[in-house]
Amino acid sequence: PGLLCYETLLAQETSDFDWPDLDERTPCSMCYTSGTTGNPKGVLYHHRSTILHTYAQAMPDVFGVSASDCILPIVPMFHVNAWGSIYVGPMTGTKIVLPGAKMGDGETLQHLIETEAITVSMGVPTVWLNLLAYLNESGKSVPTLKRLYVGGAACPSSVITEMKDKYDVYVHVAWGMTEMSPLGTVNMFKPGMEHLEGEELLEAKLKAGRGVYGVEMKITDDENNELPWDGVAFGSLKVKGPWVLSDYYKAEPGTTLEDDGWFETGDVATIDKMGFMAITDRTKDVIKSGGEWISSIDLENTATDHPKVAESAVIGVYHPQWTERPLLLVQLKEGEESSKEEILAWYEGKVAKWSIPDDVVFVDTLPHTATGKIQKFELRQEYKDYKLPEVDV
């Protein structure tokens, strides 16, 4: 009761539609950034940018789908329009299957892939780790699946190797942003790379890939000097393109892009001589957990608001399922005593539950630079092998 059949609703409508006469730069959709360095910002897409982005996605060395394919986007539509998949499907005649509420569940994904004959899918690394775990435990397979696209966080090497070796599925790393509609790069090998083997092959596959047609990239140093594409030099990643935003929604015009039209992505990257880009760090120390971004600044500010806390730092620590999870380091005020439970309880109702740190370490002092900034690099080195407790996220 209360449910409507989609096919019945379609049958009740006529096949004619009077298309409105719209200017190509008329807005057609808007998504918001995750707000890791402040409030979420609106990014408005217009018909022209969306069509051009979709053309690029449909190219053979990008998504390369056709009417004979069936795609399964494991990303919500509010997250940059499900990575653009909801547009590339209708453009190419590709069948689209939406996963529903259990989009991260390995058993559900395997069932959908098998029963709907999915050939191409896309999602964050956590999704594929869950699928792999279920396949390995159940002994089931994904017979029709040909390609996976991974983005939103660093792809574990095990996803690439196990999917190919056990299930003959090719995994392609991709990179993009809300500000880019979202696609920026896809890792598709160029001719002449067939000779790569072993660790060299895996290292190449783990890179974010080359810029898709229409996207320009460069890396610069602190003085905005362009750096070489040698795979060694790393700098601030900047992009241009027909589907890169010009300004955030309701922002002061001309305040989003640099004077020469480049967009500062906030990522630090290298680009090799073949044009393959690799993200090496986050300029704002953002923690990427299961494809979602967690602001270390927000967590630090909340912790420091606690009456017993003098100073705090949050770093990302490796997690086998979520890629990274936040670890909170706390320096208490002199003479104060506290506990992990007390500090974590302080976060309840102040930040999203899934962003609360997994663990708390109490320290006598935190390392600082000469200018008074906490040395996050030193902390990451010190706690790089830290084992987080098992918690529900």
What residue ranges belong to the model's regions?
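Conserved adenylate-forming
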Residues: 13-26, 30-72, 84, 94
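AMP-binding/adenylate-forming catalytic core of the ANL superfamily
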Residues: 114, 121, 241, 246-247, ...
